[in-house]
Structures are given as C-alpha cells and as structure tokens.
C-alpha cells in the first residue's frame, strides 16, 4: 500500500540524525583561514519531496515564514558556535548564511505567489465548471421536458389517427352495406325490367295478332260490301 506524504518541523538534533537517511545525502561544513580570520561554509544536497497542492493544504504567511527562518538561523548559529568556534569567528559565515537564506526566502515567496495564482485559477475554473454543470443540468431538464411533450404529442396524434381510421373504417363498412343494398335493388329492378320487357313483347305480339285480325276483317268486309 502506497504511503501518504507527510511533513513535520524538526530541530537541529533531528536534522543531524537524518543525515544518514536517504533524504540528505551530503552535508559539508568547511572552515577557511584568511589573513588570520576563520570562516565556516555550510552546504548540503540530496533528494527532497515535491510538495503538491491539496484541498486541505494551508500556506504560511510571510510573518510565520520569517519567524521559522529566524528560529532556524538561531538554532544553526548556536549549534555551530557550540561545535566549531566563537561568535566572532562565525560572523562572516552568518552573513553568507543569511544571504543564502534570504535568497531561499525569495524563492519560497515567489513559488508561494505562483501557487496562489495557480490556486486562484483552479478555483475560478472550478466555479466555471460548477456553473457549466448547473447549466448542463438545466439544459438536460429542458431537453427531457421537451422530449416528454413531444412524446405526449406523438401519442395524442397516434390516438387521434387511430380514431379517425376507426371512423373511416366504420364509414367504409356502412358504404359497403349501402352498395350491397343498392346492388340488390339494381338486381331487383333489372329483374322487374326483364319482366316488363317480356310483358311488352307479349303485348306487342297480341297487338300484331289484333292488327292481323283487323286486316282480315277489313278484307272480308271489302268482299261483302265492296267500296263504291
């Protein structure tokens, strides 16, 4: 299981104990003589952790940073004084250390400002993302409402179309029945016309017979009583 990063404040003694660990690989303290004066130079290097910004990360103020650096310098000067030389011998080294620490402070402050700017950018982007999420949610709700309305319209349209189809189908059935009735009536009329035609033919035959009889009677009358 991966260990979570952590940090803590350490004293000079704890700093000395950590020299044999992996974080600090080399610590050099040099004493130099020049024209009867001695100076001490402190340098160290190694692999250090990279601090990343987390939601719970808290930045120290300039005042707190100055106080921490002041305490560190005081502890370092006391340790060097007790170990190597008097205060008079450490003035030059103290000045150099102060310069290095001041440069380190400037670097830390610069990175702190950059981190603060990046944090503001991230927070602003987070607000924009939240606004976009709210807008997206509203658009999704509006889209769902439109889809519901469209679905209802489609259902109503389909139901209305089905009703119209049912009505048309009923009317078609009624028209079919009426056509069947009319067809039956036409068949009946046609039968009646055929019967009338037959009767007319019979009447015509009888008329022809009567006409022949009249002609015969007229001929007989002419024989009996010839015209003068």
Curated annotation (Swiss-Prot):
SUPFAM superfamilies recorded: MPN010-like (SSF144266), Tropomyosin (SSF57997)
Protein name: UPF0134 protein MPN_137
Coiled coil: none
Disulfide cross-links: none
Extent of the signal sequence: none
Family in the record: Belongs to the UPF0134 family.
Top-rank taxon, per record: Bacteria
């Amino acid at each position: 299981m991966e260990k979570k990063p952590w940090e803590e404040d350490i004293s000079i003694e704890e700093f000395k104990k950590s020299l044999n660990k992996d974080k600090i690989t080399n610590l050099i303290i040099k004493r130099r003589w020049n024209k009867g004066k001695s100076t001490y130079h402190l340098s160290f290097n190694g692999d250090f952790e990279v601090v990343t910004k987390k939601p719970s990360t808290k930045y120290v103020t300039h005042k707190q940073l100055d106080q921490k650096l002041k305490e560190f310098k005081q502890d370092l000067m006391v340790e060097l004084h007790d170990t190597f030389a008097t205060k008079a011998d450490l003035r030059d080294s103290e000045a150099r250390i102060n310069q290095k620490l001041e440069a380190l402070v400037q670097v830390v402050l610069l990175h702190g400002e950059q981190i603060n700017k990046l944090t503001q950018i991230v927070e602003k982007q987070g607000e924009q993302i939240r606004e976009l999420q709210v807008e997206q949610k509203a658009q999704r709700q509006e889209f769902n409402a439109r889809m519901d309305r469209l679905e209802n319209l489609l259902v109503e349209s389909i139901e209305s179309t089905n009703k119209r189809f049912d009505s048309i189908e009923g009317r078609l059935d009624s028209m079919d029945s009426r056509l069947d009735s009319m067809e039956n009536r036409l068949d009946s009329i046609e039968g009646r016309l055929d019967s009338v035609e037959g009767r007319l033919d019979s009447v015509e035959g009888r008329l022809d017979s009567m006409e022949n009889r009249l002609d015969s009677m007229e001929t007989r009358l002419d024989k009996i009583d010839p015209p003068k």
